[in-house]
Amino acid sequence: MEFPRKRRGRDSQPLQSEFMTDTTVESLPQNPFASLLSTRTGVSAPSGIREAHSQMEKRRRDKMNHLIQKLSSMIPPHIPTAHKLDKLSVLRRAVQYLRSLRGMTELYLGENSKPSFIQDKELSHLILKAAEGFLFVVGCERGRIFYVSKSVSKTLRYDQASLIGQNLFDFLHPKDVAKVKEQLSCDGSPREKPIDTKTSQVYSHPYTGRPRMHSGSRRSFFFRMKSCTVPVKEEQPCSSCSKKKDHRKFHTVHCTGYLRSWPLNVVGMEKESGGGKDSGPLTCLVAMGRLHPYIVPQKSGKINVRPAEFITRFAMNGKFVYVDQRATAILGYLPQELLGTSCYEYFHQDDHSSLTDKHKAVLQSKEKILTDSYKFRVKDGAFVTLKSEWFSFTNPWTKELEYIVSVNTLVLGRSETRLSLLHCGGSSQSSEDSFRQSCINVPGVSTGTVLGAGSIGTDIANEVLSLQRLHSSSPEDASPSEEVRDDCSVNGGNAYGPASTREPFAVSPSETEVLEAARQHQSTEPAHPHGPLPGDSAQLGFDVLCDSDSIDMAAFMNYLEAEGGLGDPGDFSDIQWAL
């Protein structure tokens, strides 16, 4: 009888694997690494091992789900959702919440905000003393006053016991109730409550930890609170009392604080929100109230505005050399219309005497000279009242007076000045008539110009220069060039160039005698009196200028002839040369 031939590797393998499996099962309790060896050698694990591994994975998943569920209950729901969040969403919101808490300072974290050596009562006393107000806590739901400090008696004259437990809206002005309700209604946490889709119940997460502040919960607003002397009752919105009486009945309070949330068991006010099981934490306004000072407006119809101003400059003889563009809106003249004209042509005749005194004072002093109110003629012939501040400008290099700066301020307009002239009486009316009679109308000259007014400034400049020569050194010490420089500076310019660049010329002995005679003639001239000066004296001053220029030119020509060999050089040893 023949048996079938057995192939190698087919029948022997099951026997070998069965043998190894029995051995592995027997050695499992003793050798924990047998399962790895059996897996590597291709031996399948028994059902007991697979069951133990499944139980271990289940416990791990249950623990992770419990931790995620606990984490989701600790995160405040920013947006209430109808479905349950998955694990990834819970972890993402947890990360966002931790990032938002990272920027919070220790000032808002409760007990860590105060030093360890200060007690709570001492800290509250220092805060109230430094704030100069009163601390109060108001519920955001109904406006009930939970707490108010004793300092309210000093600020609003209320007793602490009379305010605690009352409604804040009963003490406010009727027009401020809506504004305060708006400030209390904007809470940092949402009003909606999330609902579970499976159980159809509202999530009731226990309140754990101290209340924290959130961004956007700060409040700062004003409201009017009734005074203690007025009985607490509702007033009609449309009251006929004046603002002054309203100020006596109400005090303006500046409120600054934060919205905070507390559990009902901590506050002890379960009835404030209805006392339901699903009611959330109580939101309150913790604020500091300061009395805002009330300023009673003055009973005046005038509006304080900056007066209209413009700046002008005029030379020593009173002729304009610069006019500000703002003068056009006040006077009506363009700047180029005033340049080169004398300021006395526009002054009222009654003001000439006072303005000439100020003109002399500003030429002899370096201080600012304030003029009285005077009348200035505008382009249409009317007058405006101005007040000016004059001061002279001296060139720091040449030490010579270049011009006078005038800062002009408008006091009265055209209509006011006309009324003031009418109220002055007959004397002013007669002076006005004489002023109109003295005015001339010449082509090329501004209308209403006073006869001889253009030479008043030139006469004043000549008079001041003569006084300065008398008060200075003796006439023998002065050189002829100084005489010419002083006379030419009266008109605000020079005939042959700037005074600082002119050199003294050599003159002959005969010409020196002529200069001495001219100087003695000028020194013996009498001073001109105040007021409108005649035209002869002004013409005399200009004649002297012309004579001095002629003598100067003659000396210059004599010097050129001597240099070119055309004439006798003469003797120059007796001439005093200015260095």
UniProtKB/Swiss-Prot annotation:
Q: In which tissues is it expressed?
A: Expressed in the suprachiasmatic nucleus (SCN).
**Compartment list:** Nucleus
Q: Which domain of life is it from?
A: Eukaryota
Could you state one GO cellular component term attached to this entry? cytoplasm
Q: Where is this motif: Nuclear localization signal?
A: 4-9
| Pfam families tied to this protein | HLH, PAS, PAS_11
Q: Where is this motif: Nuclear export signal 1?
A: 118-128
Question: What is this protein's function?
Answer: Transcriptional activator which forms a core component of the circadian clock. The circadian clock, an internal time-keeping system, regulates various physiological processes through the generation of approximately 24 hour circadian rhythms in gene expression, which are translated into rhythms in metabolism and behavior. It is derived from the Latin roots 'circa' (about) and 'diem' (day) and acts as an important regulator of a wide array of physiological functions including metabolism, sleep, body temperature, blood pressure, endocrine, immune, cardiovascular, and renal function.
Name of the featured protein: Basic helix-loop-helix ARNT-like protein 2
Q: Which organism is it from?
A: Mus musculus
- Name the lineage: Eukaryota, Metazoa, Chordata, Craniata, Vertebrata
